[in-house]
Amino acid sequence: MAFLKKSLFLVLFLGLVSLSICEEEKRETEEKENEQEDDDKSEEKRFLSLIPHAINAVSAIAKHFG
């Protein structure tokens, strides 16, 4: 009977360790995805802020040549 208890304890322990490792990997993956989304948003904001400057530059060039 003691052998069964030890075996059961070992199986449960290894299962919990495995579950913990899987959850940690999942959390790391989600953090990387969130960081990537934040980077994409900041790049988009920088690009959108350049549009008015580009329009002004094009209109200045058009006035100079036209």
Swiss-Prot record:
Alphabetic keyword roster: Amidation, Amphibian defense peptide, Antibiotic, Antimicrobial, Cleavage on pair of basic residues, Secreted, Signal
Tissue specificity field: Expressed by the skin glands.
Location of region: Disordered: 24-45
Keyword Acetylation: no
Subcellular location as annotated: Secreted
Pfam families assigned to the protein according to its UniProt record, in alphabetical order: FSAP_sig_propep (PF03032)
Residue ranges, compositional bias (Acidic residues): 31-41
Name the record gives this protein: Phylloseptin-Az2
Organism: Pithecopus azureus (Orange-legged monkey tree frog)
